[in-house]
Every structure is written in structure tokens, then in C-alpha cells.
């Protein structure tokens, strides 16, 4: 299972959003196309998880909590 700390680490290492400790679970995350690619790449490299969110899924990608909720709802085969 991917933790919220895993998500924070991926975003912190691949973007200029700042250190992971500055990302509370409910903090706003600006998910532009670059940040989404960083997240997709990090999840695939570290956890073997491939995501391809649809437009309506992006509503969840506004916080660590939302991203984590999206990931935990994915079918197991991903």
C-alpha cells in the first residue's frame, strides 16, 4: 500500500514544491501536467503502480489526502 509519506516524497523529490514536511495531508497541491507526470513516474518506479486518471478523477488530486484516496480506491491489478 502506498502511504501518504510515499506520495509526499515523490512530489518533493520530483518538483519544486518544497520539502515533504511542508505538505500536510490537507494542504493544497497544484497538480499541473508536469506534477502529474512526476507523480505517475514515481508511483510506477517505486511501487509498480500505473495510473491514468480521467478528467473527473483530477478533482481528487488537490491534496495528499485526495491523491491517497484515489490510489487506495484503485483496483488491485494496477
Curated annotation (Swiss-Prot):
- Species lineage: Bacteria, Bacillati, Actinomycetota, Actinomycetes, Kitasatosporales
Name recorded for this polypeptide: 4-methyl-3-hydroxyanthranilic acid carrier protein
SUPFAM superfamilies per the record? Answer: ACP-like (SSF47336)
InterPro entries reported in the protein's UniProt record? ACP-like_sf
Question: Which biological process terms from the Gene Ontology are attached to this UniProt entry?
Answer: antibiotic biosynthetic process
- Keywords annotated in UniProt: Antibiotic biosynthesis, Phosphopantetheine, Phosphoprotein
What does the PTM comment of the record read?
Answer: 4'-phosphopantetheine is transferred from CoA to a specific serine of the apo-form of this carrier protein.
Which family, according to UniProt?
Answer: Belongs to the acyl carrier protein (ACP) family.
**Pathway(s) of this molecule:** Antibiotic biosynthesis
Give a short account of what the protein does.
Answer: Involved in the biosynthesis of actinomycin. Acts as a carrier in the transfer and thioesterification of 4-methyl-3-hydroxyanthranilic acid (4-MHA).
Positions bearing O-(pantetheine 4'-phosphoryl)serine: 33
